[in-house]
Amino acid sequence: MKRWVKVWEKFIEEKIREIRETVGDSKAIIALSGGVDSSTAAVLAHRAIGDRLHAVFVNTGFLRKGEPEFVIKTFRDEFGMNLHYVDAQDRFFAALKGVTDPEEKRKIIGRVFIEVFEEVAKDIGAEYLIQGTIAPDWIESQGKIKSHHNVGGLPEKLNLKIIEPLRDLYKDEVRQLAKELGLPEKIYNRMPFPGPGLAVRVIGEVTPEKIRIVREANAIVEEEIEKAGLRPWQAFAVLLGVKTVGVQGDIRAYKETIAVRIVESVDGMTANAMNVPWEVLQRIAFRITSEIPEVGRVLYDITNKPPATIEFE
């Protein structure tokens, strides 16, 4: 254990030095989402350059339930960071109007993210963009499995210089580093959440109404998994964009279908569908169909990775 502590201490020292040397007397912004990757990168960068780091939290409209409040409270109030909150929901929805291809979605989201970051950077005079990119992000992007909004989704021409202090780490290593940096468990044990957010948990075109449905379903899945004391790698809901026939009283119903995905993994590179107790799945299905009037059917995805990826898009 002591050996690993020393390894992380050395890693932290090296990364702090690298960030300081790279940024110099300039300012930097960091793309902060509240997930473990960007949070760890933010704390590392904050130690390196202090108030010259400006954390930018963009509300895309594709966030989990309660996410904006959680991020603002944690990083502005508890960590004392310079936090810039940007409400860009209308901008992202407009950019994705009519788009159904998942790769196109990711690239558009990456482009709009960068546009927002460049605007904030210009306002504060920052030259650098720090990102929480980790190894699986660029491995999947290079392998053309899927573009990650912070790698394959980035435009070719950037006005900001990119710094990626975590790019050689895997998720389990980032969690260890976060713990070593003193981040609370509510951060370092958070389930991974895709950079494009709920936009890639809606199959087909993204609309505010569809996002509202999948956000509520996702919250129910997370709540029930936590109540059951289960610790999966990821647990979430996907709106399939397929309506099926059901019965409501004595009347025919034609409603949306939600898929539930719960997997176990160590680093996200491979994953197994979790053998969730039947009563937990039943509770999830009951709550989703009872609390979200638009949903009439809930399915459980039992596919491993490979052949499937963890996220549907």
Swiss-Prot record:
Gene3D superfamilies: 3.30.300.10, HUPs. PANTHER family: GMP SYNTHASE [GLUTAMINE-HYDROLYZING] (PTHR11922:SF2), GMP SYNTHASE-RELATED (PTHR11922). It comes from Pyrococcus furiosus (strain ATCC 43587 / DSM 3638 / JCM 8422 / Vc1). Heterodimer composed of a glutamine amidotransferase subunit (A) and a GMP-binding subunit (B). The gene is guaAB. GO terms for molecular function: ATP binding; GMP synthase activity. CDD domains: GMP_synthase_C. Its EC number is 6.3.5.2. It comes from the Archaea. InterPro entries: GMP_synth_C, GMP_synthase_B, GMPS_ATP_PPase_dom, NAD/GMP_synthase, Rossmann-like_a/b/a_fold. Pathway: Purine metabolism; GMP biosynthesis; GMP from XMP (L-Gln route): step 1/1. ATP binds at residues 33-39. Residues 6-190 form the GMPS ATP-PPase domain. GO terms for cellular component: cytosol. It catalyses: XMP + L-glutamine + ATP + H2O = GMP + L-glutamate + AMP + diphosphate + 2 H(+). The keyword Zinc does not apply. Pfam families: GMP_synt_C (PF00958), NAD_synthase (PF02540). The keyword Nucleotide-binding applies. Keywords: ATP-binding, GMP biosynthesis, Ligase, Nucleotide-binding, Purine biosynthesis. Catalyzes the synthesis of GMP from XMP. SUPFAM superfamilies: Adenine nucleotide alpha hydrolases-like, GMP synthetase C-terminal dimerisation domain. This is GMP synthase [glutamine-hydrolyzing] subunit B.
